[in-house]
């Protein structure tokens, strides 16, 4: 499988993914996942896509949302196309049955996922988190996501995301 853009894509290599991602992929029966090293200074989506020749619509962002109700905090990961924005205060807040929902603080997201900020991916997240995927992501043939590290990316068939634990496909998760 050839990856998008002008990157040197190779089969997933342990040194190019965060430890929780490598562990999750060790149990995943997919052979068509690719990784590519990138300049960590270009990990943010717009800069990454422009520099490496990737269409924004072929890139998906994973954000960690914290929903709170009283003293209870629930987390979810949301995967949406880079051309859209997550509906945090509508769809996600209702799904988490929370009074308030917001992007998780950076330190919390990093500590809870074991991944680098700016590289968080839906692969290898805590088992009790829902992974909310906007249906538009699945309409892509191939999608580029984080690797858990800022210095690399993963490319995979979008439909492979359906194999993730805790995945829920949601229409209108993003707009």
Where are these regions (language model features)?
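Extended, low-hydrophobicity, polar/charged segments
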Residues: 1-175
């Amino acid at each position: 499988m050839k990856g998008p853009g002008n990157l040197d894509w190779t089969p997933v290599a342990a040194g190019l993914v965060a430890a929780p991602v490598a562990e999750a992929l060790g149990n995943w029966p997919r052979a068509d996942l690719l990784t590519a090293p990138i300049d960590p200074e270009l990990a943010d989506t717009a800069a990454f896509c422009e520099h490496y020749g990737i269409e924004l619509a072929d890139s998906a962002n994973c954000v960690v949302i914290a929903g709170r109700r009283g003293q209870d905090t629930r987390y979810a990961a949301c995967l949406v196309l880079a051309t859209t924005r997550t509906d945090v205060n509508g769809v996600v807040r209702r799904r988490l049955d929370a009074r308030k929902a917001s992007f998780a603080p950076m330190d919390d997201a990093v500590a809870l996922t074991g991944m680098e900020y700016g590289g968080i991916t839906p692969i290898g997240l805590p088992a009790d988190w829902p992974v909310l995927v906007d249906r538009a992501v699945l309409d892509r043939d191939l999608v580029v996501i984080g690797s858990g590290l800022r210095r690399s990316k993963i490319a995979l068939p979008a439909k492979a995301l359906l194999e993730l634990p805790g995945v829920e496909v949601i229409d209108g998760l993003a707009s």
